Amino acid sequence: MEQFYYILKYLILGLFQGLTEPIPISSSGHLVLAQHLLGLKIEGFSFELLVNSASLLAVLLIYRNDLIRLTKNGLSYIFTRAEDAKSDFFFIIYLVIATIPAGVIGVLFKDYIDQYLKGVKMVGISLLITAVGLWIIRNLRGRRNDGDLSMKDAIIVGLAQACALIPGISRSGATIVAAMLLGMKQETALRFSFLLYIPVSLGGLLLSITDIAKDPNLDTLFVPYIVAFIATFIMTYISLKWFMNIMAKGNLKYFSFYCIIVGVLTLIFL
């Protein structure tokens, strides 16, 4: 019976992670709220690594063609200086640059964030901040595409991503808001945001992979972890595909409304 409880518990959290990771409502914030509301407590740091890895796998699957093209053209530009591969080469460079702020800030301030910025009230405040950002860009229609990006754009979007280390600040929301305020087209902002998710997640996974082996709960939670991984992967794939359709229709304001409602309810009742 206890094993069934653990499986159900991690299934719920995995579905939460998968649903909220791609869309701009903060997966980390919703995991904090889910644990609080359902009386759940995650045993061990491995769970966070596990579900992030599952979401990463789903993003890799969806953007596989972009990744293949970027890799091919990036190498082509390095060895042949082919002009038609130049924009993809620099797109990769800008992704690397945009990864740095979150990596540096995460390493330097991880303990502070864990101790002071992961409370339920902080999640409520951060969700309201996310809502404001999404509302501001609700009607923006940029003109800049992949080939128009610059180092300044990469740094600004990277700093926006670093803000999402705070639960309640959506990573996809923060990066898309920053990108669209810089004049990027919606599809360019979306692609840059989720391709940027890949190196950040890989970096975090590689830096913390030993924590999985050291997790004292791994033996008892192996099956629940696998259930959570599968649930997160499937839900992330579905959720990201759905979000891409929402972006194409310009309906980001609904996510703003949602974040306002959840943020206010969190501050009032939790």
Swiss-Prot record:
GO MF, one annotated term: undecaprenyl-diphosphatase activity
Membrane-spanning intervals of the chain: 5-25, 42-62, 89-109, 117-137, 192-212, 220-240, 250-270
Reactions the enzyme catalyzes: di-trans,octa-cis-undecaprenyl diphosphate + H2O = di-trans,octa-cis-undecaprenyl phosphate + phosphate + H(+)
A matching Pfam family: BacA
Protein's GO biological process: cell wall organization; peptidoglycan biosynthetic process; regulation of cell shape; response to antibiotic
Enzyme Commission number(s) from the entry: 3.6.1.27
UniProt membrane topology term: Multi-pass membrane protein
Keywords, comma-separated and alphabetical: Antibiotic resistance, Cell membrane, Cell shape, Cell wall biogenesis/degradation, Hydrolase, Membrane, Peptidoglycan synthesis, Transmembrane, Transmembrane helix
Location(s), subcellular: Cell membrane
Gene Ontology annotations for the cellular component aspect, listed alphabetically: plasma membrane
Chief place where the protein resides: membrane
Family stated for the protein in its record: Belongs to the UppP family.
Known function: Catalyzes the dephosphorylation of undecaprenyl diphosphate (UPP). Confers resistance to bacitracin.
Note: Bacitracin is thought to be involved in the inhibition of peptidoglycan synthesis by sequestering undecaprenyl diphosphate, thereby reducing the pool of lipid carrier available.
Protein name per UniProt: Undecaprenyl-diphosphatase 3
Record organism: Bacillus anthracis
